[in-house]
Design a protein with these regions (language model features):
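Bacterial N-terminal signal peptides
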Residues: 9-17
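Active/ligand-binding-proximal structured segments within catalytic/core domains
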Residues: 52-101, 325, 335-348, 549, ...
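Bacterial N-terminal signal peptides that target proteins for export
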Residues: 1-9
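Charge-rich, well-structured scaffold segments of protease-associated domains
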Residues: 39-42, 97-297, 363-524, 601-747, ...
Length: 968
């Protein structure tokens, strides 16, 4: 105890010294986050904001460097290095760095030679040598040790991203693990070692493959290329070219790391439950002697020439047609232009009352049109994006967008939109500040752009100062009718995509039972445990009746003045597949008192919004916004549902758009895979039951659709309230605005069952692409048993739990088979539901056989590791200690437990049981619940590129049509 006291006292003295010795500190009066910003002597920025809603801290480490800083001959480097930052250092990720280093040096040398070879046979032979040395190096390496470290301390959301301007590393950690986090991050950033290079290269290439099937990504790359002839925003992409990705340079990567990964180019951003003084002391202790780079190169580029005539480009692909227009703007460092641009884009399109919203979307002139400003530090973009109706040309959509943009310069908009826009921005910021991730992201954005916090945190004041004249002048200067780029995304084959075969890779050693002394030191470090706080439904929320047949779930919002009212009805697509079309129709209609445009404009003025949602088993009507205005907003929505005036012209146009949307969905790889997954899990009867046939859709009348919505109000339902009013006030307010029948008909919940899989079979759906999507599913009919929950959750954590799980290690790290892969034992969502097991992977077509074989191997013969198990268990327990249910999330959690027949959540019992479980329990789950299953394998891909004879070895193969899986 005495030693603990001494250590604490020393820590506080160090913290105080850190505060007083810091010569560059910043606080801003009136900052709603009460932020503290410090610059250490080595240039490292530390941004902090305290939020004690849960005992966790969102951390971002932001590097002011991204794709724009890539060498021209090795584009994609910044993003690739982001991946390599997860491979460890000299202290972790290896069992013997001294023995490993000569092999890593040889791999580096071989890759430098490899990238100069053009002869295919010589390249193949060189890659065999690289693979051989890499395998030897893998015997010493300890893959995924970083992820083990983060899992061990209870981190969530371990990840990173790279854009043109930034590379950001994210962890959400328990509050008591800040020092361990700092120790690991300091070592990782200061002493990175590049290992696991060739298998990670395959993962990066799979990510590139996925981007090549995204026509939206290709469209935006073309926009940037048109706008920026000199700046890297337009001359190179974050993911790089296919050719350069296959010819990487470890030398260039190391040079990049040494140049940009330095303290005077990095910010640590923290938001959560912590003591800023202690946090700063830790940062200074572990990062303070990190040497800066006084010679960080400034990005050099020639200023862009003015665009004097529209630049037109075409891109091709299988997805639905669209057209985008973009104008070049000053970068986000120009605070005035950025503020006016944000307001101007909201006047043009805000989802409710903007010019495009009312003049284009509400009038059904196109399928859909959007506008937004895309801010970047060096140059920003003002963008419109439009999808054509059936029979409409992209040029016609372009002209409609130009007409709306021209209204900004002409001042052809109501000045009241400016005040409404600022109020809605204030509401959006209020919501942002509820969440640690959003709070810390505000720091990241300011740091990357080089905007002082005193300016960044006053952005709403700048928005409020924008006048109509400012918007007009902005549009006249930047949004002229001749200085834009237009990209037409047309249907057709993209001939620029190169088909590259996957190299032969020897699976590297995973060394699960090895651990570094560094990891052991972190594991042995004692921290004061955070006491768990499990939900108590009798105290944490209030459940009662609003009226006969109408239940109320209430939770008070103590954070801000936002209120949300949600009406939930146990009727969804299973009971009536036309319900979602009825909700879609309603949004175009008005009442005898207000037109549709007036409703949208009034809701925007109130800083409120409403939404309708229809899933398999329920329909939701939600109203949310500033608490004082929610009663009026709820009244408007209720009057609309009960008194909507039909319009047959609108309905006819809606039907045409729905048919077009169906055709477009069949062109989307993601939509096709979603449909195939539903078909695999639920079967053809489910598809038929939840999908209107074309004939049924055509025959729908206004009276049918609006009648379905009015009927909902005659049914029993549940009302969720989360807001600042007391329960008594909320009850009175809702009762006054909400229509409730005298004797509402009760509606029982009905759920979509999953199909049992007594024998294995293969379902193949066609989609022409360089990669396949794969989903295997098994249901043996086992019913929900709450006694199994703790063991199943621990199995899922060990086997499929993120980057530390067996799946990630085997499928991505060891074999380079995919960018993403997952597998888990699915627990039922209602008490009579059944367990299922699924596995998912996406990869290039020539990796199909290896992917399926290796998945089946690890599923049926699960690798066993006491070390990996201990880390999985420790991480799961740590996350449960810091798990908190707040706001609407608590009400949803209560409803989920109720569906499972639970009066109280299982969390406490699961937490207690987990502490006594061993690897033997996980092995027992695998043996009893997972091994030896029969599956339905669903594969979306090009049959001409798939190994069909191999698939027939898995079971009978049935080739489906897109009509089969979509139901139309």
């Amino acid at each position: 105890m005495k030693n603990l006291f001494i250590k604490t006292a020393v820590a506080l003295l160090v913290a105080a010294a850190a505060f007083t010795s810091c010569d560059r500190c910043e606080r801003v009066k009136g900052d709603p986050m009460k932020s503290l910003i410090y610059t250490l002597d080595n240039g490292l920025k530390v941004y902090m904001t305290v939020n004690k809603e849960e005992p966790r801290i969102q951390t971002y480490i932001a590097v002011r460097s991204g794709g724009k800083n890539d060498p021209h001959e090795t584009t994609g480097l910044a993003h690739y290095f982001e991946h390599l930052m997860f491979k460890g250092s000299e202290q972790f990720g290896t069992s013997d760095y001294a023995a490993e280093k000569p092999l890593l040096d040889e791999i580096e040398r071989l890759f430098e030679e490899y990238r100069t070879i053009t002869d295919p046979a010589e390249r193949l032979e060189m890659y065999r040598r690289i693979d051989s040395v890499s395998y030897e190096a893998s015997k010493i390496a300890i893959p995924n040790e970083y992820d083990k470290l983060m899992g061990m301390i209870g981190a969530r959301g371990t990840n990173a991203w790279t854009s043109q301007d930034e590379t950001v590393y994210t962890e959400d950690i328990p509050s008591n693990q800040l020092e361990n986090w700092a120790i690991v991050q300091a070592d990782r950033f200061r002493h990175n070692v590049i290992r696991g290079f060739h298998t990670e290269l395959e993962a990066v290439y799979e990510e590139k493959n996925m981007s090549l099937t995204s026509d939206t990504e290709k469209l935006f790359e073309a926009l940037q290329a048109g706008l920026f002839k000199n700046h890297p925003y337009g001359t190179q992409t974050v993911l790089g070219t296919q050719e350069q990705l296959k010819n990487p340079s470890i030398v260039n990567i190391k040079n990049y790391y040494n140049t940009f990964y330095v303290p005077n180019n990095i910010a640590i951003c923290l938001s959560g439950d912590f003591n800023p003084r202690e946090a700063l002391a830790l940062v200074k202790k572990y990062f303070g002697d990190w040497a800066p780079n006084p010679d960080i190169p400034t990005l050099k580029y020639e200023a862009e020439e003015p665009i004097t005539t529209p630049i037109e480009k075409d891109v091709y692909g299988l997805e639905a047609e669209m057209v985008a227009l973009a104008w070049r703007l000053p970068g986000s460092r120009d605070l005035k232009a950025t503020s006016v641009g944000e307001v101007a884009s909201s006047v043009l399109c805000n989802g409710r009352a903007g010019l495009i919203d009312l003049d284009i979307n509400m009038q059904q002139k196109v399928m859909q049109m959007y506008a937004f400003d895309n801010t970047q530090p060096d140059y920003s973009m003002f963008v419109t994006l439009g999808m054509p109706k059936q029979g409409q040309t992209l040029e016609q959509v372009r002209d409609l967008a130009l007409e709306e943009v021209a209204k900004l310069a002409a001042g052809d908009f109501d000045e009241s939109l400016l005040e409404s826009t600022v109020n809605n921005i204030r509401l959006r910021r209020m919501r942002q500040l509820e969440n640690n991730s959003n709070r810390a992201r505000l720091f990241v954005e300011a740091f990357i752009a080089g905007i002082p916090w005193k300016d960044a945190c006053k952005d709403i004041d700048r928005y409020a100062s924008v006048t109509k004249e400012d918007v007009m002048a902005f549009a006249q200067e930047y949004l002229r009718p001749e200085n834009f780029v237009v990209v037409y995304k047309r249907m057709g084959e993209d001939t620029s995509i190169e088909k590259i075969s996957a190299p032969a890779i020897t699976p590297i050693e995973t060394n699960r039972d090895k651990s570094s002394a560094f990891l052991q030191s972190i594991q042995d470090k004692e921290v004061k445990p955070i006491e768990p706080s499990f939900p108590d439904f009798s105290k944490d929320l209030s459940a009662g009746q609003l009226a006969q047949g109408v239940n109320l779930l209430y939770k008070k919002n103590t954070l801000n003045e936002i209120a949300t009212v949600e009406l939930l009805y146990n009727r969804g697509k299973l009971q009536d597949p036309a319900l979602e079309d009825a909700f879609a129709y309603l949004q175009y209609l008005g009442t005898s008192e207000m037109s549709a445009a007036e409703i949208s404009a009034r809701m925007y003025e109130l800083a409120c919004y409403f939404s309708f949602d229809c899933d398999d088993n329920s329909s939701s009507i939600m109203v949310s916004g500033l608490s004082d205005n929610v009663p009026e907003a709820l009244g408007i929505v209720e009057k609309l549902i009960l008194g909507a005036e039909p319009d047959e012209g609108i309905l006819a146009a809606l039907k045409a758009d729905l048919f077009k949307a169906r055709d477009d969905a069949k062109k989307s790889q993601d939509a096709c895979f979603d449909a195939l997954t539903d078909y695999v899990m639920h079967g053809p009867e489910y598809v038929k039951r939840t999908t209107l046939s074309s004939a049924d859709l055509s025959s729908l009348s206004s009276e049918q659709l609006l009648g379905k919505l009015r009927e909902l109000f005659e049914k029993g339902h549940e009302v969720l309230y989360y807001g600042p009013l007391s329960k008594e006030e909320a009850t009175k307010t809702i009762a006054a605005a909400h229509h409730m029948a005298d004797n509402p008909e009760p509606l029982a919940e009905e759920f979509a069952p999953t199909v049992q899989t007594p024998s294995s079979k293969v379902l193949v759906a066609p989609y022409t692409a360089a990669n396949f999507y794969y989903y295997q599913f098994s249901n043996r009919g086992e019913k929900y048993d709450p006694a199994q929950t703790a063991r199943i959750r621990l199995y899922n954590e060990y086997f499929g739990g993120g980057m530390n799980g067996i799946v990630f290690q085997e499928m991505r790290e060891a074999r380079g088979l995919a960018y993403s892969a997952s597998a888990r034992l699915r627990e039922p969502s209602w008490k009579d539901g059944e367990y299922g097991f699924y596995a998912y992977i996406a990869s290039q077509n020539d990796k199909l056989v290896k992917a399926v074989e290796n998945f089946d191997d690890i599923i049926n013969d699960m690798p066993e590791s006491e070390r990996a198990f201990d880390i999985a268990k420790q991480g799961l327990l740590s996350r449960m200690r810091t798990q908190r249910y707040r706001g609407l999330r608590l009400l949803d959690y209560y409803r989920n437990c109720r569906r499972l027949g639970l009066d109280e959540p299982l969390d406490k019992a699961v937490f207690e049981e987990l502490q006594g479980l061993t690897l033997e329990d996980v092995k027992a789950i695998q043996k009893q619940w997972v091994a030896g299953r029969t599956y339905t394998y669903g594969i979306l891909g090009d049959p001409a590129d798939l190994d069909m004879p191999y698939l027939r070895m898995l079971g009978p193969v049935k080739t489906l049509t897109l009509e089969d899986i979509f139901g139309y």
